[in-house]
Amino acid sequence: MIRTAPHPFSIRAFILATCAAGLSACVGAPGPVGNASVPEPARPVSLAAYLGQWYEYGRYEAPFQKGCEGVTAEYSLRETSGDARIRVINSCYKDGLDGEFDQSTGKAKVVEGSDGAKLKVSFFGPFYGDYWVLDRGEPGVDGTYPWSIVGEPSGRYLWMLTREAQPDAALKAALEARVRELGYDWSLVRLTQQPPP
């Protein structure tokens, strides 16, 4: 969709991969559908502008992320001859910012014909899940996107990511408005605690 916990990283990574791949029956009940008609991504995505560290501003709570705070995701390029050339490192603190640190490492590949806005992400072997960048901000002076909204076709998963741990009030309001415009139920959003600046 990520300092985030590594996917595949233990059972948590397996759950993430299988849920995202639509195999939730294997790992328990998924969350409620927050968007019955997930739209196609709004704009092309440049991989170069997407790479780097992201902070999770909010999400739809999911079993594999339950209780996670201080969530981050970092994307970088892998040295590989295959198509899964993106490294994903997901990190969080369990049950609070002073909780146990958890990290997972996965890989991702861009879906052909998606203008860079759709990825397939795996944290466990051959299992890949959908990761759609539904919208993102215009590149800043450093050439990177300042925010992104990530979802997938089922409408059960949603993430809002920013480059700053503590986005300002204007960006928070803009993210909420855009999430609503995309058809998501804001009442299901769980805001993520991040460390103060």
Task: For each feature predicted by the language model, list its residue ranges.
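Bacterial N-terminal signal peptides that target proteins for export
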Residues: 2-15
